[in-house]
Amino acid sequence: MAVYTKVYDSYAQAESSVRDLEAAGIPSADISLIANKYVSEQYADVSDVSATSTGAGLGTAVGGGAGFLAGVGLLAIPGLGPVVAAGWFAATLVGAAAGAATGGLIGALVDAGTAEPDAHVYSEAVRRGGTLLTVRTNAASAVQIDGILNRYQPIDPAVRRREYEQTGWREFDPAAKPYTPSQAELDRIRRR
């Protein structure tokens, strides 16, 4: 099974992709989303954040934008803080967080087939307010899924890496503090 991973600058872009994937018959069980907690506060009624800063577990959340996101969990990931986590990849990430030596989000992305340099960019993009979307698929659906995911302008990891490097960034640092909503918005404005 192939895994497609994209990061969007806004939750709305990712949500549109999820809706189109579901409309195309992609099972919700094969779709996963990870976004900063502040995004969840805009789109879901977050009722509890019980995960620790080391990524030890899931909290609870109620509501959600896209249908499959109802009942999403909150997961604390080093360098990202609390994130909204829904779907199969979130479960993979919980396992990676429990065995901290596996590398957290970067390790989970690499294990799912993402090149390590791109995994660093994707992790940094989520830290800065982006939304990560992963989809599992068989070969028969690959072209369709790729088209849907690219429809809503996901980031280009090579371009984004160059933008980040212009500010002195080299790779994702799990010890770095997560961006606040205002920092994330300023970062988006700077890149426009």
List where the protein language model places each region:
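Intrinsically disordered, low-complexity, hydrophilic segments
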Residues: 1-192
